[in-house]
């Protein structure tokens, strides 16, 4: 049992403290909401189609999309373009493509998951480019323009508003440079992609007027920039520096990971690279920049224990906080546009938890038919905690635990024009370890919130063991095929632990934290809501997906401006028997803390998943939202 003292009071004797005082808040875009992965298997149309159509991979993406609204907005998938199949050449030698597999996957991302792709212009599409080296530039321009116009013709330009477009991933590496680009042909390719984006039209035609093309930004070169042996990316920067106004890329993207798995390494590596680039090419300072692969260490499939437990979640949160600090510092990362995490992979046995993924994947080969079970890792919960941050943030603060170790504090607010805001969200992040003579850590936090009406607070914790499914699995002997009882035990440890919630009546109330007995590392999310904050809206798009016989994954969509004060969700079920008769409504999530919009329901061999489902939210004031629409599910 955790012994965290969390009091709303006044405390005279403290070992470390700060108050909100005259804190400066800055507009904070949520710049960390991208994930990515590379599909397994062959890199051709058949291989990529099979990989992205795999039910386990689709369930993996469905769970990632079931984080709180805004936690993940973009997904970057290598070789996604290979879903487009070359069909034939027309009489004038122009390629004709079959977009059916590409359309199916894009529809899945957009309509079911509400995710936007980061479309990397990389692939060979049946050999079109390798077989026509003299036509490559024209064919790339044609493919880019045709792909975008095809999507606009299907669904209108509004669907593409949040799409991102990027050049070939890490073109200097032989493993990716399937086209054998030279410095010259790579520049031709990038400029062809730029022309294709510029010529792709907005085909929405209203009132008979011919609309102007919509400008679409191009990101690149998605490079490692490791040394002089990476000429393709460096040459592109040279070109852009000479004539910035004609630079084909609008956002300079790079990859910098850690070495030993720390957030500091990721950020320092990014700072060093951008400082080097600006020293060589000072004209590029006007371009926004993005670290597409801001991961703790290279090699997603390499098994590492820290990637299984709370430590990876803490590292990801710390990475975000340190990038925010670097952005505010006015140095080489002042133009930071976004970072992305390459952790949307599907893990495999025997490394279910320890690979760089958001979810642990168990392939249950003993069932008929075989199926996949996915368990949320603490890093998944960490992304959900970050999604609750406000729209304005102070700089990161460090509060000493002892002479060598500090707690990182990031305070954010939303709403409220005349004061700090009607909504406050603060993340406290411990170090991974501290000295044996660590002073008992007391943390005094003054809310300093202009309270027009009643307010309430809620605290959630991410800590070892209690919010660590990996620990539960290890305690059970790490079975390859965890049974239903163990799977439920792991899922009960998925979410951040709800610690304490209650009302606040007094202006400048103080939060006191005594974390001396909490096992390190830990993260705490504190949210404070005014009663005047928008009430919970009805959950939308309730969806029921089959996992296996008598087991379903239930997810729904949140309204972006009404879930900041959410405490938990309730999932209700009304069974229908074989004769079509309905029982009473049952609260099937009784006893679960569900801060995120999903729930996996497995009633057991004697139960049934056939029937009706509905969901509602409960906020920190114990008020409920309207129920979602009722959805019927029938297992065939």
From Swiss-Prot:
Sugar-modified residues: 180, 268, 365, 448, 453, 483, 622
- List ligand-binding residues for alpha-L-iduronate: 78, 169-170, 257, 293, 299, 342, 356
As for subcellular location, the record says: Lysosome
Q: Where is the signal peptide?
A: 1-16
Does Repeat count among this protein's keywords?
no
Binding positions for alpha-D-mannopyranose? 39, 43, 45, 300
Q: Which InterPro entries match?
A: GH39_C (IPR049167), GH39_cat (IPR049166), Glyco_hydro_39 (IPR000514), Glycoside_hydrolase_SF (IPR017853), Glycosyl_Hydrolase_39 (IPR051923), Ig-like_fold (IPR013783)
Spell out the reaction equation it catalyses: Hydrolysis of unsulfated alpha-L-iduronosidic linkages in dermatan sulfate
Q: Which GO terms describe its biological process?
A: carbohydrate metabolic process; heparan sulfate proteoglycan catabolic process
Q: What is its main location?
A: other
Q: Name one GO molecular function term.
A: L-iduronidase activity
Domain of life (superkingdom): Eukaryota
Active site, UniProt feature: 170, 293
Outcome of gene disruption? RNAi-mediated knockdown results in dysregulated glycolysis and lipogenesis, and is pupal lethal. RNAi-mediated knockdown causes the incorrect acidification of lysosomes leading to dysfunctional lysosome-autophagosome fusion and consequently, blocks autophagy flux. RNAi-mediated knockdown results in a significant increase in the number and size of lysosomes in the brain. Expression levels of genes involved in glycolysis (Pfk, Tpi and Ldh) and lipogenesis (ACC) are increased.
Q: What disulfide bonds does the UniProt entry report for this chain?
A: 529-565
Q: Which UniProt keywords apply?
A: Disulfide bond, Glycoprotein, Glycosidase, Hydrolase, Lysosome, Signal
Q: A Gene Ontology CC term for this entry?
A: lysosome
- This entry's Enzyme Commission designation comes to 3.2.1.76
Q: What Pfam families does the annotation carry?
A: Glyco_hydro_39 (PF01229), Glyco_hydro_39_C (PF21200)
Q: Which family does it belong to?
A: Belongs to the glycosyl hydrolase 39 family.
What the protein does comes down to: Essential lysosomal hydrolase responsible for the degradation of glycosaminoglycans (GAG) such as heparan sulfate. Required for lysosome function and autophagy. Consequently, has an essential role in the development, maintenance and function of various cells, tissues, and organs, including the muscles and the central nervous system (CNS).
* UniProt-recorded name of the protein: Alpha-L-iduronidase
Q: Which organism is it from?
A: Drosophila melanogaster
Lineage, broadest ranks: Eukaryota, Metazoa, Ecdysozoa, Arthropoda, Hexapoda
Gene name, per UniProt, is Idua
């Amino acid at each position: 049992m955790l012994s965290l003292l969390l009091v709303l009071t006044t405390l005279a004797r403290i070992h470390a403290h700060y108050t909100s005082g005259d804190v400066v808040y800055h507009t904070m875009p949520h710049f960390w909401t991208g994930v990515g992965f590379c599909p397994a298997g062959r890199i051709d149309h058949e291989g990529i189609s099979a990989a992205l159509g795999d039910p386990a991979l689709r369930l993996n993406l469905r769970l990632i999309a079931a984080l709180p609204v805004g936690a993940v907005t973009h997904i970057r998938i290598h070789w996604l373009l290979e879903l487009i199949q070359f069909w034939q050449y027309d009489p004038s030698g122009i390629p004709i493509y079959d977009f059916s597999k590409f359309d199916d996957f894009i529809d899945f991302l957009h309509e079911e998951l509400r995710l936007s792709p980061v479309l990397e212009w990389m692939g060979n599409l049946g050999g079109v480019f390798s077989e026509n080296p003299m036509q490559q530039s024209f064919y790339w321009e044609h493919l880019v323009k045709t792909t975008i116009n095809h999507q606009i013709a299907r669904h209108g330009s509004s669907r593409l508003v949040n799409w991102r477009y990027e050049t070939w991933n890490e073109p200097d590496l032989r493993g990716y440079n399937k086209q054998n680009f030279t410095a010259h042909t790579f520049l031709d390719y990038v400029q062809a992609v730029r022309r294709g984006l510029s010529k792709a039209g907005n085909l929405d035609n209203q009132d008979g007027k011919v609309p102007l093309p919509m400008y679409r930004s191009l990101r690149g070169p998605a490079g490692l920039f490791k040394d002089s042996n990476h000429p393709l990316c460096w040459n592109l920067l040279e070109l852009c520096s000479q004539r910035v106004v004609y630079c084909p890329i609008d956002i300079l993207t790079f990859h910098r990971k850690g070495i030993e798995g720390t957030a500091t390494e990721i950020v320092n590596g990014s700072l060093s690279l951008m400082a080097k680039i600006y020293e060589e090419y000072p004209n590029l300072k006007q371009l926004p920049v993005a670290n597409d692969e801001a991961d703790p260490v290279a090699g997603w499939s390499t098994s590492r224990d820290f990637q299984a437990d709370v430590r990876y979640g803490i590292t990801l949160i710390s990475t975000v906080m340190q990038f925010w600090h670097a952005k505010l510092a006015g140095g080489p990362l002042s133009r930071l546009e976004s970072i992305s995490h390459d952790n949307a992979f599907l893990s495999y046995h025997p490394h279910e938890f320890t690979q760089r993924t958001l979810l642990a994947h168990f392939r249950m080969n003993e069932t008929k038919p075989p199926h996949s079970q996915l368990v949320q890792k603490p890093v998944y919960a960490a992304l959900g905690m970050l999604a609750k941050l406000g729209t304005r943030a102070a700089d990161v603060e460090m509060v000493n635990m002892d002479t060598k170790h500090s707690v990182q504090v990031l305070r954010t607010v939303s709403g409220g024009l005349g004061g700090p805001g009607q909504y406050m969200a603060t993340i406290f992040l411990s170090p991974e370890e501290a000295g044996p003579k660590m002073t008992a850590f007391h943390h005094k936090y003054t809310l300093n919130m202009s309270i027009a009406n009643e307010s309430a607070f809620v605290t959630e914790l991410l800590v070892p063991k209690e919010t660590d499914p990996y620990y539960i699995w290890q305690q059970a002997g790490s079975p390859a095929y965890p049974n239903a009882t163990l799977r439920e035990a792991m899922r009960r440890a998925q979410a951040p632990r709800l610690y304490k919630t209650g009302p606040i009546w007094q202006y400048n109330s103080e939060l006191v934290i005594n974390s001396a007995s909490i096992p390190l590392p830990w993260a705490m999310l504190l949210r404070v809501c005014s009663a005047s904050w928008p009430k919970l809206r009805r959950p939308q798009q309730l969806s029921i997906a089959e996992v296996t016989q008598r087991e379903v994954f239930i997810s729904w969509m949140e309204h972006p401006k009404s879930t900041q004060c959410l405490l938990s969700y309730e999932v209700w079920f009304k069974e229908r028997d074989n004769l079509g008769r309905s029982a009473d409504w049952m609260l099937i999530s009784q006893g679960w803390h569900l801060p995120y919009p999903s729930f996996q329901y497995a009633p057991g061999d004697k139960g049934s998943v056939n029937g009706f489902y509905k969901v509602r939210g409960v906020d920190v004031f114990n008020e409920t939202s309207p129920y979602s629409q009722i959805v019927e599910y029938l297992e065939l």
